Amino acid sequence: VKGAEAMGQGHGWEGAVLKLLRGKDFVFTVTGAEQVTEHYRRVHLTDGGMLAVTGVHPTMWVRLWFEAAGKPHQRAYTLVDPDPAAGTFSLEFALHDGHASDWARTAKPGDTIEATVQGTAFTEPDPAPSHILAIGDPASLPAINSLLTALPSTPTTIWFETPTEAVETAETAGAAPELQASVSVATSRPDAGPSAAAPVAIRSDVVEDEAGSAVEPAGHGAGAAVLSGAQDPSDGVRDRAAVPIPTPGAGGLPLRLDPAHHDFRPIARQDAGARLITQVKADAPALLAETPDPYVWIACDTATTRSLAAYFRKELGLPKHRMHALGYWRP
């Protein structure tokens, strides 16, 4: 306990606030890393006892602490394939210039990093979605995977914003090997017991925009953590077999798609997200009209997220409880 208290005191005013909000501190240890693509890296870690304390739920995320100019800063990342029994999980990073990416690029076995758990939770929409409309980009890829894993048989349309060259290459050259995505097929294990369930999360550092939807002010990492592989609290542990299939526009990223249920629509990023907004507005009205209980999930840059959240609430009349919107990064 003393060690955790000292850790929290070393995190500056942000750490002090999280401590007041009953945040729990842990130290993770790196066990390995792999370069998924040139700009996307996966780091494997042990949890420092975290999962035994917190349990696991879909889209679960943690706050990692990085030092910049002698001051601590926290960034949030979604857990990938958390295993409470083994005390392990992975994190995925969309690499760019910044202290979090610098750490991920050089992370090696034995390295440690401090983390705080506060604010993460998951509440399955009620009634259950008849169709999910998910809108994201590489920063929110882990959370998209997590959502798909939690509701594997729900029809889902995914608008995925990518760097321009990824979509252009796919459109002109077909599904080249470097653009294939690793897709996981989830199958229930009847012998697996239920995982610890925990009651999408409105975070302490999230503010509501003019549409009444939660939009994080800054810095959800890189992706904010992928929840690909998190356990479904109702179904227990799931096995996942990676099946590489052509996914034009994915840029080689590890999307966990099921062609029987998921409609993947890559959109090249142009005009600071304007092209994505235009495409979603063109597609969404018909999709919403076709389904009785839609659920909209948005996790793009803050400006795009605010614009789309306002569109669904004000222009399409979507009830607030049928939408989850978080800005993951600032352009």
Question: What is the role of each PLM region?
Answer:
Residues 175, 188-193:
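Short basic-hydrophobic amphipathic alpha-helical segments used for membrane targeting/insertion
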Residues 188, 231-233:
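Hydrophobic alpha-helical membrane-insertion segments
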Residues 2-174, 183-186, 200-202, 206-210, ...:
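Extended, composition-driven regions rather than compact fold-specific motifs
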